[in-house]
């Protein structure tokens, strides 16, 4: 059984490494999904494939879906891949995967991305995705301190940036966390919000979150 698993892992890695076209990449990703393997070597090979094909949205989307499926085993490899690569396109897909997973190990990175100054629309979108990841972490983690830190960072995102999309994402995340502290943050910010879309979303969130 061990030998068979080892051979299967080698085959999966080989298929990932040899995938030169988007069609081949999608087949290799499907094989990983079907195998449900959580071996680090296979996950690392999948990340390498994502780094090569991240500009093909269908391939990148499929890879992210599998990386989310393989969590929590995929979290550490995703974090390591982000730190070791400077390609912003590849990093954006990593952030999307980590935000969808919502593992507390990714909190510091997601918080860092939320606070990053942006030079273009794509980078701004990554910040919004990271903010949504903080909402998922803050609403599911059992550590109260982590939840409080998530609310603190989302509060910053709500009142500091000029990016209305980031503020909107922060509102949705605070509603997801849904604690009295989240309600207090939204309540204090709603009067000063200049964008009517964001302000309307704040009011909707406040109706759904308990004040105490």
UniProtKB/Swiss-Prot annotation:
SUPFAM superfamilies the UniProt entry points to: ARM repeat
Keyword entries, A-Z: Antenna complex, Lyase, Phycobilisome
Top-level taxonomic group: Bacteria
Record family assignment: Belongs to the CpcE/RpcE/PecE family.
Protein name from the UniProt record: Bilin biosynthesis protein PecF
PANTHER family in UniProt: PBS LYASE HEAT-LIKE PROTEIN, PHYCOCYANOBILIN LYASE SUBUNIT ALPHA
Organism from which the protein derives: Mastigocladus laminosus (Fischerella sp.)
Function: An enzyme involved in the biosynthesis of bilin.
Keyword check for Lyase: yes
GO cellular component: phycobilisome
Pfam families per UniProt: HEAT_2
GO molecular function annotations of the record: lyase activity; oxidoreductase activity
């Amino acid at each position: 059984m061990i030998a068979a698993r080892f051979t299967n892992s080698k085959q999966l890695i080989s298929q990932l490494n040899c995938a030169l076209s988007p069609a081949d990449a999608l087949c290799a990703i499907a094989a990983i999904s079907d195998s449900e393997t959580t071996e680090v070597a296979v996950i690392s090979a999948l990340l390498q494939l994502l780094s090569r094909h991240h500009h093909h949205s269908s391939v990148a989307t499929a890879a992210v879906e599998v990386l989310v499926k393989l969590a929590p085993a995929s979290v550490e490899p995703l974090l390591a891949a982000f730190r070791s690569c400077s390609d912003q396109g590849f990093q954006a897909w990593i952030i999307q995967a980590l935000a969808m997973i919502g593992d507390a190990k990714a909190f510091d990175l997601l918080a860092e991305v939320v606070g990053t100054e942006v030079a273009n629309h794509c980078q701004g979108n990554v910040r919004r995705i990271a903010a949504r990841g903080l909402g998922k972490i803050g609403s599911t983690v059992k550590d109260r301190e982590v939840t409080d830190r998530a609310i603190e960072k989302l509060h910053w995102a709500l009142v500091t940036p000029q990016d209305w999309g980031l503020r909107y994402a922060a509102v949705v995340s605070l509603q997801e966390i849904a604690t009295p502290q989240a309600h207090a943050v939204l309540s204090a910010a709603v009067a000063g919000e200049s964008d009517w879309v964001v302000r309307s979303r704040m009011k909707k969130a406040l109706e759904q979150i308990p004040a105490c």
